Amino acid sequence: MAELKRTLGLWGAAGIGIGAIIGTGIFVLIGVASGIAGPAVIVSFLIAGLTALLTGLSTAELSSFITESGGSYIYTTKAFGRLPGFVVGWMKSFDYIVGASAVSIGFAAYFTYFAGIPSAVGTLVLVGSAWPLILMVLNLRGMKEASGTNNVLVALKIAALVLFILVGGFYLFTRGDFSNYHPFFPRGISGAFSGASIIFFAFIGFNTIAVIAEEVKEPEKNVPRAVLIAFAICTLLYIGVSVVSVGLLNWQVLGLSSAPLEAALRVATGNFLILEFIALSALFATTSVIMSSIIGGSRALFAMARQRVIPGVFAHVSRAGIPFATVLITGIAIGAIVFLTNGNLDWLASIFNFGTLVTFFFINASLLQLRRTMPDAPRRFRVPLYPFTPVLGVASCLFLSFYLSPNAIVVGFGWVAIGLVAYAVNRRRSRVPPEPAP
């Protein structure tokens, strides 16, 4: 069986997770959610963070005794069998590709702005298609090189968010005017929950650490720790940013801004360098998300190919110790989707939300099942308050599914149907023998 090289330590793995979590969401969604929840967007971040933490804890336990690449695909396969595992892997792989395609367009918009290039559709598509290919080439050099670049980008965007919190917070508390926090619930508690349903998707990405478990040293110890470290850092940054943002700028104004962090910080400082660095951090954020998506998407496909639920040719490992074929496919697919859709990804992006909830549902359900079928497996981490934690994780996914648009549900199930046809064709061709029931 082809194996990947273990090159990542604890902080390298955590960096991959932080890179996948902190994307353009915090730079844009803070405004959208503030317009819905008002100052209670702070509560929205807490609700969304706690909801995502349920799945994060389940991921941490599963990764402590299942150390193969594949993450949610491997967990679901071991818990429920090959077909449910394929559905989860199919959705998650496409999530990586579609999510990165949307982020690539975001990168192109920021890049053309800073480069002083007119942001015509053709220019955005060209830049958005080319950038994933450049990052793909970097990934082909090896995980160590890709992780090193990612860690630099992660450090820069963390520095930008910390700078925002410090500068904005200092101004806010020295001024002593907290009127923007009142009324705290202008849309009621329902507004806070509606805001949380949007913000929730800014917390996903920690599962990428589990997907690359096979490339982490001492994965049974380092992967669960990396998941929790990444989650804790991102949650603290998100809550800090939300507290400062709504304190500096009226929530209604914040909700109408296309660049809410920059708009809020202009209240606290007119320093050109600080404002430009905060704005530039969107370039760091988008690049690290694309980088992490290529890493995660390629490893998810690799894990499926190694078990031959997709053609085994995609399980090839290069001399650099990386899944060469699936890195190529993932990078090219990201660029191709941007190009073929002419940058119009709204209808495809709906699959992302659907696929995320499917994946999180099965992560929590897999923990419940594997506690029953593999009770003696050595676990370096155990979910607290079991079984309530994974049960609440399952329930939260079902609850959030009611907030999905009809388009997301139709397109999502349509993509599952396409996957099932592909699965049946590949199984017939490869003649995979039936497996025993789990």
Each language-model region and where it sits:
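Membrane-interface loop-to-helix entry segments
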Residues: 122-174, 186, 227-231, 349-362, ...
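Hydrophobic, membrane-embedded alpha-helices of multi-pass small-molecule transporters
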Residues: 8-27, 131-134, 168-171, 184-244, ...
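Membrane-interface "cap" regions at the ends of multi-pass membrane proteins
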Residues: 1-31, 36-40, 46, 52-60, ...
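Hydrophobic alpha-helical segments and their helix-loop junctions in multi-pass secondary transporters
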Residues: 114, 155-183, 242-249, 360, ...
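Helix-loop-helix connectors at the membrane interface of multi-pass transporters/channels
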Residues: 1, 77, 83, 104-127, ...
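C-terminal membrane-solvent junction of multi-pass transporters and transport-like membrane proteins
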Residues: 186, 313-324, 360-408, 429-438
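TM-loop-TM module centered on a large, flexible mid-protein loop between adjacent transmembrane helices
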Residues: 74-75, 112-118, 184, 195, ...
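Hydrophobic transmembrane alpha-helices that form the core helical bundles
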Residues: 32-36, 44, 53-132, 136-140, ...
